[in-house]
A protein has these predicted regions:
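A compositional/biophysical signature of low hydrophobicity enriched in polar/charged and small residues
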Residues: 1-152
């Protein structure tokens, strides 16, 4: 069951998705824009994070502009190993998304690293640690969209 959010929560969520203030006191700036106190903004964001609605607040970077590469990976993982496999994959800092899919290749994740060699090394480690050797890597050749905005 999704936690209840009110109109003020929605206004905060809409604002911080793409216009998070880069100031010394960002929550004060958000409050000023929305007619709230800094303390109320912090409390609401804390509650939204504690309830799992907000996963993280932080910067998003374009990997290619920083010299990094990215790939979409898929694994054919036995049902009884899915949780273990996902846990091991999630230990890698360059993993940004990790999903179970209803497919022969049933785990899909994205990985970013300074080089394809590093990605290949990480995938080899994952295979060794999990025993899952049916992994594919589909390196990005062109980025069409990297930003999602959810208007609430």
């Amino acid at each position: 069951m999704m936690p209840a959010i009110d109109e003020t929560d929605k206004r905060i969520l809409n604002l911080i998705q793409s216009d998070f203030p880069t100031t010394a006191q960002p929550y004060e700036a958000i409050g000023r824009e929305l007619g709230l106190s800094e303390a109320e903004v912090i409390e609401r964001i804390r509650r939204l994070k504690d309830s799992g609605i907000i996963r993280r607040i932080g910067g998003n970077f374009v990997p290619g502009k920083l010299g990094f590469v990215s790939t979409l990976c898929a694994g054919r993982v036995p049902e009884e190993k899915i949780d273990e496999f996902a846990g091991i994959v999630n230990e890698y800092r360059g993993v940004t998304h990790n999903y179970v899919r209803d497919n022969t290749y049933n785990i899909w994740f994205t990985m970013i690293a300074p080089s394809m060699d590093e990605i290949d090394q990480s995938l080899a480690e994952i295979a060794k640690k999990t025993g899952v050797t049916s992994l594919i890597s589909l390196p990005a050749t062109k980025v069409f969209k990297i930003k999602a905005q959810f208007n609430l």
